[in-house]
């Protein structure tokens, strides 16, 4: 059970973090900024910032997954505990990712990268801010 939770959290980290980087245009600039902030916070292990850049539903889903790991401290506590299982190699991959495409439609955006191997990251505008949304 713990192994499956570890795999889930590693998969979430890869799916959420690797696909994020650059775009162009007004909403696209905002998506880019949110994406870059998310990646920087993840690399710095600034879990409070990482969680602030996630939708409320995404945080709730992460917290439910974290219950399997007995992670305390809400979203931040789950990321802190999960980071111990992610490993340095996965974290170093964040240094070498590149955006392939960005598509903004209303309050949702899709960001894809080569590193994500066909698994795009979704962002959603929530309270006027672009946030990572893995509930979509």
Located regions from the model:
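Bacterial N-terminal signal peptides that target proteins for export
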Residues: 1-12
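C-terminal motif of bacterial Sec signal peptides marking the signal peptidase cleavage site
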Residues: 19-22
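Bacterial signal peptide processing site
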Residues: 24-27
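Short solvent-exposed beta->alpha transition segments
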Residues: 32, 47-102
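Short helix-adjacent coil turns
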Residues: 38, 42-50
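Ser/Thr- and Asn-enriched, surface-exposed coil loops between beta-strands
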Residues: 103-107
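Short beta-strand edge/turn micro-motifs at domain boundaries
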Residues: 110-113, 118-136
